[in-house]
């Protein structure tokens, strides 16, 4: 009896380890979680088939929201043990520095600062000479030099796009795989890192279009798209299909529209998906049309031109998708 129970526990542990390796967090709403694999398939409870799980922080478990099956346990809480209610309290009570970052190549390295207030020109030239030698010593191999160049380019593009740190970390992780695979040889570092960032944003559920990314890099859009397909094929990365709903928050934020516009736009997109209207359509164009419809329904009107600019699509795309959705979903737009 005990042997059978021990075998069952071992099987459960093996299953949980496989889940951790294969799946990653897709959506979080409060304590409710959903996970997907690289192909976009949702993780299902092995007992009841449910796809929604609950995080029990007190017990360190993730359980099925339907039947209570324990999917993962012994999850460590990496947050602080203290509580803070203001930014000042948080700063006062923190006892550690920031974590090491993948997006920087200067972890735990003392840098020679060249911005001196001293007017002494001789001193400044001496410091610049030391700085130059420090850079030569630190970056020795071609791999390191390439990585530093890519990191600087990634930081520049990401800053222009306003993407979060998680996307930058993911992009650099993908780029390191590309670099180790020898795919960078003979290709533009700018195009490769831009393709990695596009891929990372989709992985993190915060997509940025190739048109949007190509605005902030010297690499042409076609070259970035070519590199993107090469990376996905050679590294066998299967990305989930772009969800139009993921484009809505960015459009709404840029247009400074209220939150209920986003909710209404997402409702329109979900209804369109149920009726099979989203297949084969540009997700950014669909999201733009849904936001336009929501703005008309809620009385927070924005022009098609404004919405097209926020979504990085053409006015014609917004107009065509708007007409399709309004007709097929039988949406009555109030005339003012």
Curated annotation (Swiss-Prot):
UniProt superkingdom: Archaea
Keyword Iron: no
Database matches in CDD domains: CYCLIN_TFIIB_archaea_like_rpt1, CYCLIN_TFIIB_archaea_like_rpt2
Encoding gene, per UniProt annotation: tfb
SMART domains: CYCLIN
PANTHER family assigned to the protein according to its UniProt record, in alphabetical order: TRANSCRIPTION INITIATION FACTOR IIB (PTHR11618:SF13), TRANSCRIPTION INITIATION FACTOR IIB-RELATED (PTHR11618)
Zn finger spans (TFIIB-type): 41-72
Sequence repeats mapped onto the chain: 152-235, 246-327
Function: Stabilizes TBP binding to an archaeal box-A promoter. Also responsible for recruiting RNA polymerase II to the pre-initiation complex (DNA-TBP-TFIIB).
Keywords, ordered alphabetically: Metal-binding, Repeat, Transcription, Transcription regulation, Zinc, Zinc-finger
NCBIfam families noted in UniProt: PRK00423.1
Residues involved in Zn(2+) binding: 45, 48, 64, 67
GO cellular component terms, A-Z: transcription preinitiation complex
GO biological process, one term: transcription preinitiation complex assembly
Record protein name field: Transcription initiation factor IIB
Family: Belongs to the TFIIB family.
GO molecular function per UniProt: DNA-binding transcription factor activity; TBP-class protein binding; zinc ion binding
